[in-house]
Structure formats: structure tokens, C-alpha cells
Amino acid sequence: MAKLDVFDIKNKKVGEIELSDSVFNDEVKEYLIHEAVKIQLANRRAGTVGVKNRSAVAGSGKKPFKQKGTGQARQGCRRAPQYPGGGVAFGPQAKTYNLSMNKKARRAAMRSALSLLFKNNKLTVLNNIDLDNVSTKNFVGILNGFTLDKTLVVTDVENRNLELSARNVKNVKVLKSEGLNIFDIMKYQSVIFTENSVRKVEGALQS
């Protein structure tokens, strides 16, 4: 099994942790990672753009004047595109960009992303990262001790002090293990796990 050193928040080694090979040392399938990221980003799109065509514009459908005998061009109704306030011809309509990926492929993509981080030495495991109070300075000091930047921090439980301490730090994001997703894994250059969060992620992604 793959192993990683476990550190405390002062960057002192306090032990080792065995990682599941099926989660953190799996075959890296880059095409699956690409597909999963593409789907996640597509599903964020709202697709709310839209204009009213002649059937959606409020107003009467009555013919404005008779067909013949006026000398004017024939008209069907005042909701037509050529009238002020009429509907738009061939304008953009709201659409959904949602894509889907089956659970087996989604989990395989997550395992590939985590395995890629492990093989590139971008994973750090801490025994815990509890903060007694809200302090951005203390949190930045912890990160500087590991010489990390653009970092994703994954915890096993909600840690309000940690979240508030990190929210104003550039290129840092704190997530619970349940919220871990492939886009954030690939976006951040390094990932810090707590020991318990590693076990939770392994339990969720075990093949």
C-alpha cells in the first residue's frame, strides 16, 4: 500500500498513514478527468438568456387593418418583429447545458485525480488542523510552514474557525470531505487532508 507521512500543524512528523492503492495509487485516466471537469463546469451554467418571440409578447393577435385596399403592406398582427414592441425574430432562447456522467465513471475520475496528486507529491496529511480561534495570521503561518500555495484543505468535520481564518486568503479553499470534487482537486496545486478525511474519502471512492 502507498504510504504518506503524517504531520502536525507545526510541520513535525507524527506518524505515517497507509493509503488505499485503489483510491490514491490507481491508474491515471486523463480522459476521464477531462470529461468529469467538463461536465461539472457545464452543469454550473445557468442558461438563463432568452428573449420573447412573437407568440410570447403581450398584445392582441388581431389583424391591424384589412388585407387589401389600404395601399400598405399586408400585416398579420402588431406582435410581429417589424413592429416596435413586437417579438424578436430568431433570438436566443433559454436552454440547459446539463450533462451527466454515471457514478462508476465519476468515481474513477476522482480516483484518477487523487492518484495524479499522489504521484506528483502534491498530497499532505495532517493529524488535525483545529484552530482555537479565528486567525488568518495563524492559518497563513501553518501554510508557510509547508511552503504551499494554491491549496485545497479537506477536513472531515465542519471547522468554523478554520473556514473563517482561510476565507480571506488568496488561492486557498476549505472543504469538508463530502464536498470534495474533481474541479477543485485539479484547480489547486496542493491538497491538505486530515487523517480522518482521508478515511472518509477512501470509504466513498473504494472500488
From Swiss-Prot:
Source species, domain of life: Bacteria
Gene3D superfamilies per UniProt: 3.40.1370.10
KW Phosphoprotein (keyword) present: no
Transmembrane regions: none
Stretches the record annotates as Disordered: 58-85
Purpose: One of the primary rRNA binding proteins, this protein initially binds near the 5'-end of the 23S rRNA. It is important during the early stages of 50S assembly. It makes multiple contacts with different domains of the 23S rRNA in the assembled 50S subunit and ribosome.
Record family assignment: Belongs to the universal ribosomal protein uL4 family.
Identification of the protein by name: Large ribosomal subunit protein uL4
Organism annotation: Geotalea uraniireducens (strain Rf4) (Geobacter uraniireducens)
